[in-house]
Amino acid sequence: MDLSAVRIQEVQNVLHAMQKILECPICLELIKEPVSTQCDHIFCKFCMLKLLNQKKGPSQCPLCKNEITKRSLQGSARFSQLVEELLKIIDAFELDTGMQCANGFSFSKKKNSSSELLNEDASIIQSVGYRNRVKKLQQIESGSATLKDSLSVQLSNLGIVRSMKKNRQTQPQNKSVYIALESDSSEERVNAPDGCSVRDQELFQIAPGGAGDEGKLNSAKKAACDFSEGIRNIEHHQCSDKDLNPTENHATERHPEKCPRISVANVHVEPCGTDARASSLQRGTRSLLFTEDRLDAEKAEFCDRSKQSGAAVSQQSRWADSKETCNGRPVPRTEGKADPNVDSLCGRKQWNHPKSLCPENSGATTDVPWITLNSSIQKVNEWFSRTGEMLTSDNASDRRPASNAEAAVVLEVSNEVDGCFSSSKKIDLVAPDPDNAVMCTSGRDFSKPVENIINDKIFGKTYQRKGSRPHLNHVTEIIGTFTTEPQIIQEQPFTNKLKRKRSTCLHPEDFIKKADLTVVQRISENLNQGTDQMEPNDQAMSITSNGQENRATGNDLQRGRNAHPIESLRKEPAFTAKAKSISNSISDLEVELNVHSSKAPKKNRLRRKSTRCVLPLEPISRNPSPPTCAELQIESCGSSEETKKNNSNQTPAGHIREPQLIEDTEPAADAKKNEPNEHIRKRSASDAFPEEKLMNKAGLLTSCSSPRKPQGPVNPSPERKGIEQLEMCQMPDNNKELGDLVLGGEPSGKPTEPSEESTSVSLVPDTDYDTQNSVSILEANTVRYARTGSVQCMTQFVASENPKELVHGSNNAGSGSECFKHPLRHELNHNQETIEMEDSELDTQYLQNTFQVSKRQSFALFSKLRSPQKDCTLVGARSVPSREPSPKVTSRGEQKERQGQEESEISHVQAVTVTVGLPVPCQEGKPGAVTMCADVSRLCPSSHYRSCENGLNTTDKSGISQNSHFRQSVSPLRSSIKTDNRKTLTEGRFEKHTERGMGNETAVQSTIHTISLNNRGDACLEASSGSVIEVHSTGENVQGQLDRNRGPKVNTVSLLDSTQPGVSKQSAPVSDKYLEIKQESKAVSADFSPCLFSDHLEKPMRSDKTFQVCSETPDDLLDDVEIQENASFGEGGITEKSAIFNGSVLRRESSRSPSPVTHASKSRSLHRGSRKLEFSEESDSTEDEDLPCFQHLLSRVSSTPELTRCSSVVTQRVPEKAKGTQAPRKSSISDCNNEVILGEASQEYQFSEDAKCSGSMFSSQHSAALGSPANALSQDPDFNPPSKQRRHQAENEEAFLSDKELISDHEDMAACLEEASDQEEDSIIPDSVASGYESEANLSEDCSQSDILTTQQRATMKDNLIKLQQEMAQLEAVLEQHGSQPSGHPPCLPADPCALEDLPDPEQNRSGTAILTSKNINENPVSQNPKRACDDKSQPQPPDGLPSGDKESGMRRPSPFKSPLTSSRCSARGHSRSLQNRNSTSQEELLQPAXLEKSCEPHNLTGRSCLPRQDLEGTPYPESGIRLVSSRDPDSESPKVSALVCTAPASTSALKISQGQVAGSCRSPAAGGADTAVVEIVSKIKPEVTSPKERAERDISMVVSGLTPKEVMIVQKFAEKYRLALTDVITEETTHVIIKTDAEFVCERTLKYFLGIAGGKWIVSYSWVIKSIQERKLLSVHEFEVKGDVVTGSNHQGPRRSRESQEKLFEGLQIYCCEPFTNMPKDELERMLQLCGASVVKELPLLTRDTGAHPIVLVQPSAWTEDNDCPDIGQLCKGRLVMWDWVLDSISVYRCRDLDAYLVQNITCGRDGSEPQDSND
């Protein structure tokens, strides 16, 4: 066709635009087999499948980052038709015009005529992002001239590379080819002179080259197409470039001088010969166009390519050719090419010297133009890094050799920027240029086959572009940028320009992942680059090459190093230290890079957060080929990534995924599992903390670095960071043994590094959440320790995930401080992992894996270490100093030494933690260290006893394993700490989750820990091994536990004393109470030392202000359930508790799993439960034990603190029970734990908890008021199987969580309430035992127990429950006979201690005594919990008629708790006995004078006052909605409620408490007959048990008015939770009307509002529901009563007046309602009047004055219409015609308003403005 060039170009532009629209964003080719995603983006089916297959985690749409799945992909036939039609059109166009429009990426195939067109018009190669294509295309179409002018300017700024083609030398052309690379997306277009756009952030002016061979042109075109398709393909294209090289050489030979210089600064326009040449030039220009930025991008891409060694190799040859050409080496081609390259690179004026190929010119012009060019190149590279184009680096390398000839610095920059690319290219270039020789040395060997290249071209590059590239390329880009920047720093102008351009042009969001890599790169490459920059070009190249080599497997050096990856890594990290220039340059560069990273990289990282989605492409980088690893390493900068790569090379454990290599360095399986998680974690963490991302990558470099990295942003001095990084790297080197053992430290071995990396990754979030500031505190001094610790600890943590590694890492972690420092971070990291796992939808699989792997690893490891180290850990944790003197301190001696290191490090870490909130513990020194250890250890897998474990871990990394072991073995001892033990096992996990979720909360917790540690100082030191951490983690809970576990605590103390008298002594000073208990416990048994420790620590916390600090936290924090949960869930959970409500939050989060963290916690709980199961199995737990374990697991699954508390008791008890069976001491400890737990639970409300246990066990049928007693029963392990108890507790906790969340988010609240109430319903459901059992079964399912429990197990549990129910019936009968007979136990704490002391005996009596556990639960809780003890005293347990033996059995109750597992019948009997005893106790307690309660209270007031109320309020509430209701009463209205809640620290009388407890017991389905007996007893003892308030609360019947459906749902959940009745209509039974009000409690008037006032109901604001949910207790309605309405006034107090009034409002009035009325039916109005005492007349004739009543006719004149029959006014006049508003207003204020104002005669019809709003509501 004879078309004008304009028309052709327009058509071509249109075709290109269509191609862009129809191209696959992944492969940048026309979509083949298009498939659409849910986000309506279309991709090639193959591309998407490859993407999906390569992603371990949830894949994300490359464009919008929405998650995609294979299922969501749908074929798009119409789109395929469009593509086919477009191809046909393009084919026709090409046939007609002779121009190639292939895919819109190839330069036009114009023949000479087209080339003439090119000559005539400037070719604008404008790369337009996917989003900007249309605009750019339109702009291109608008006119090439304008673009040409503007582009020329831009190019001058950016630096334009112009190439000359020899073939077209004769054709000087003024025409310029502008390549505008401005797209954010990886997609770019190369607009031929026709307007093909090449995507790049840089505009490059290309002079069309002379005409070349058609083949060359075609190849150039193809290359151009490829290039446009993907700059990554540029490398491949470079192959075509090779073909083009001669052409380019010829072009170079051509005279560029003919071409006017368009570039203002560095823009060089070389006249190009033919159009064909123009296209080839465009290609060549592409190469040239790829400036430093592009080189950087290419570098990254090249790294990707290096991964694809084949492609890299082929590229090498091409690059070599192009480089030779660029360098103007002896090769003519090189010369020709070099000249244009140099010209373009240098932005030379050599246009005039088109044939002057000498590098001299480049040298002359290199400096400024090259810098400018570099900046533009960097810009392009950045863009390419987004696009993952390697061609840029190739071209840049090509130019670079020229520039290298020109300037070593330039070469250095290009080399560093290009890194691997230049290396490979330079390898070829080595021959042509000695300067390049170094680079050649560094150059990688690219052995990747062409097929790989093709794959890379099609997908690898594309994917790498988006996945690896955003990850690697961006990192490379950033690194290159940094590298370039350092180089730029050398070349000052270039630096600034590069920064600006990069920050502006690049959109980091596309490279979110790269942020992480950037960090690593920053560190490693900064080191490398620093070295490079500091060193000569060659040296820099070699070093850079080393880094690059490490990154790129292709590099010879890297291969050498890869051969010895650990050594090379050590050398690499070490080389940073070794290389003087490197270390110096590292600090400098690091500062620089830190600045840059903090600036542009931060932005990029921030943006990249979203771009992290790019990760989906990462799978390519995951290619097992070492080059891929190398590429990743390139991104992460040789040092860390190299190390990783080397490590991965050494350790082939699934390091294929180099980007995730670090993570992969962890156990291969875990690495693979964790990698996606880690990436997710990185993503989430990076998203939250861009710097954190860096740290994650930096963590790859060095876990120390990563901790530091997060600090890096925090670090005031990047220099320091660099130094620290170096130190960290060096530290791992120094700790090579440690590192090697630990997994090779960071540089030492990739095991450490991977673990570090994963640790770092999680660590970064931790630092970000928790210790970022702290880390910065640690930076200078601690960073090393932190590094070492982080490496080691990270290793340990990894080890926890990977037991083998953990053992090695733990043992090898040179310093406990490192471990324990790092464990903190590590746990945080783990939290991040968990969170990210949640984010990545890996939760299910990950959790399962965690169950199977992580759980067992940490569990097995810890269990192994725990038993031997239990004492040591206890002692060591108890006091680091004690470790030295203590014989057990042997391991502790090591621990001590390490802890000495730890302490120094911990000092730093503590400083960090101090920042986090552990300043005092940190300051405390060793105790602080212990505390720190505890905190950190909480973070660590064996976090529960981290303090000790830290000591142990500090002692040796195996210490962690030992700690794991220790946990297992300790669990019997820990049973007292009970939850602690499980916590230890599962706690590590859970803590991690909680800690993650709690990141900031950790600070609070840490603060609490600090305080508690300070208060507990000695106690913590003494009991720190077991309880310090618990105290830490459970700070508040610990205190609660101390109170609760007071009795067991004594036992624990005695065990502790026996085990380590020093510890007991130390703990004794902590608290007198503690000492007393300790002494008692000493008397009782040394076996309970773990419990004692927990109790000690906890008690000191309670008695100390520390607990008050905890108490400052929400009440739930103090809840027994929560406290125990925190204890059981682990210190991590406690941390969460401090920030949130430890237990309750965890419970809520766990149960509701509202947040990833919560979910993680829940998952962790599941894992923990699972572990516990395993543990119980390990403990030779019988099926019964398994059942409790399952129940415990269920409770854990429910993630309920109550579960943890009771369940923990049960589980630990059960496992320990099995162990206890094996070992009486263990069982006694288990009993102690149970007692402690129950005591803790009961402390806050013995009966409530016991009732709750039994209630939940029997169907959790404790109702509102009785809920707490029922809960007490439910919590009685004997009464209720742990699963039920836990379920119920979990449900209650969940309910509280839901309540809490309800408050925070109504929807969430509704969901939470629903969830909680559903679960609670299952557990709390009605008093029918059967329903209880059913609910329990349901709960097990609801609690995700179904995953853990088999159907058979569930059936067995159900059967056991049924048996228990039957036995309870028997118990009921017994209670009826003996219910009123008190057992006469001493009411005082001494009785409890005695009971505790008797516990050992109870062990013997367990089977029998266990039966009495319910009763003992009440007793034990009393004794265990000072507050409860006081209550119990007032109640007195002893008077309960429970003999001391019974009491002991109560103490032993845990064993019955075990026994239910072993023998549900015995448990049932025990329960029945307990119920009987409890009932008796309740009766006697009720009968006990309040004086006893008061007298006892003072003793426990300190502990009780702080914890009890919170616990009582919080725990009772969390434990049950009933308890919540009752707790509201104790707080505001009813002491009996306090009794129920057992919160009555001071106010609630013992009788009331006992009554409440009794009521709870009665209600508890656990005792069907027992309930009856209890009820009878209660009624006999004191009808006050069901006091009017209590009964009123229980009898609350609500209606809602004016609420939205969501709010109604929340109220429903609220009612279900608190066992409140909720009806749709107001009835006589209705007590409360819930109505929406404003802050002043002013409401809209509704029908129910009027009816409620008329009926004397409570008109309560909806805020009451919300506040009660928030407070997790049923608040008094007094404060929420409506004060007014919008019509009659805001404070008329009508509702209150109506309730208090003894007279009817309208008494003596005879009223007739004359219809019509609006908004209110007549019958409702009449009902309203009747409620107010009026005599309603149905018919007007009946209205007479003779009756003596005042006749009134109510009318609504406003409702009269012409259509309606107006009433006969004459007849109406029989009475006073009054507006109905009079009734409404009078009722509102509950005062008769003046009738005169409402007489119809006196007012207009408009008067009825006050009709009720939504009166029908």
From Swiss-Prot:
GO terms for biological process: cellular response to indole-3-methanol; cellular response to ionizing radiation; cellular response to tumor necrosis factor; centrosome cycle; chordate embryonic development; chromosome segregation; DNA damage response; double-strand break repair. Phosphorylated in response to IR, UV, and various stimuli that cause checkpoint activation, probably by ATM or ATR. Phosphorylation at Ser-975 by CHEK2 regulates mitotic spindle assembly. Phosphorylation by AURKA regulates centrosomal microtubule nucleation. It comes from the Eukaryota. Residues 308-319, 640-652, 959-976, 1405-1426, 1473-1485 have a biased composition (Polar residues). Residues 1354-1381 are annotated as: Interaction with PALB2. GO terms for cellular component: BRCA1-A complex; BRCA1-B complex; BRCA1-BARD1 complex; BRCA1-C complex; chromosome; condensed chromosome; condensed nuclear chromosome; cytoplasm. Heterodimer with BARD1. Part of the BRCA1-associated genome surveillance complex (BASC), which contains BRCA1, MSH2, MSH6, MLH1, ATM, BLM, PMS2 and the MRE11-RAD50-NBN protein (MRN) complex. This association could be a dynamic process changing throughout the cell cycle and within subnuclear domains. Component of the BRCA1-A complex, at least composed of BRCA1, BARD1, UIMC1/RAP80, ABRAXAS1, BRCC3/BRCC36, BABAM2 and BABAM1/NBA1. Interacts (via the BRCT domains) with ABRAXAS1 (phosphorylated form); this is important for recruitment to sites of DNA damage. This is Breast cancer type 1 susceptibility protein homolog. It comes from Rattus norvegicus.
